[in-house]
Amino acid sequence: MDSVKIINAVKEARNSAKPRNFTQSVDLIINLKELDLSRPENRMKQQIVLPSGLGKEINIAVIAKGDLAAQAESMGLTVIRQEELEELGKNKKQAKKLANANQFFIAQADMMPIVGKSLGAVLGPRGKMPQPVPANANLKPLVERFGKTISINTRDKAFFQVYVGKESMSDEELAANIEAVLNTVARKYEKGLYHVKNAFTKLTMGASAPIEK
């Protein structure tokens, strides 16, 4: 889709939304067509790094011990050590609370078996199983990437709605993020954007603005 048309849709969405006393999110809605979504290979399930970032802070939890846990703490990240991890395995309510409070999880690789046993049933269905890293990993690049990442999982639905930024971002920044999502869809399918029936963008409290093909 043409970048100018995407920018025009962002402008229309912005103009149709009344001012609110909070910063509204901007979403992209895509309806798909002519895909057999009973076949897993036709479903969208992936992470996309948005070039303009998210326009907001996200929460990341690190399951680690020793030096990696200390590094995560120095970065201000939520740290879950082995003792706490084992306790979470016995307290499903707390485990769900943790899962909902954090967008991404990172785990020290040698702790993954305990993670699977303690949190797998909670994180798995949410698409939040941790990214495993070695004990001597530098967390900074991964944390920076997660800070620009959104997740899409259509399951068996022929549409998805995904966050692409905040209204405080410029039209060009939002358009670049939308284009990144559309390009990911185009690369996913052999016929590319042919499988996009239509696409819209909207602010939280605003009307949907169509993106012209």
UniProtKB/Swiss-Prot annotation:
InterPro entries linked: Ribosomal_uL1, Ribosomal_uL1-like, Ribosomal_uL1/biogenesis, Ribosomal_uL1_3-a/b-sand, Ribosomal_uL1_arc, Ribosomal_uL1_CS
SUPFAM superfamilies: Ribosomal protein L1
Keywords: Repressor, Ribonucleoprotein, Ribosomal protein, RNA-binding, rRNA-binding, Translation regulation, tRNA-binding
Swiss-Prot/TrEMBL GO biological process terms: regulation of translation; translation
Gene Ontology CC terms, in alphabetical order: large ribosomal subunit
Single GO term (MF): structural constituent of ribosome
Segment forming the signal sequence: none
Classification via Pfam families: Ribosomal_L1 (PF00687)
Keyword Ribosomal protein: yes
Family from the record: Belongs to the universal ribosomal protein uL1 family.
Described purpose of this protein according to its UniProt entry: Binds directly to 23S rRNA. Probably involved in E site tRNA release.
Assembly with partners or alone: Part of the 50S ribosomal subunit.
Record's protein name: Large ribosomal subunit protein uL1
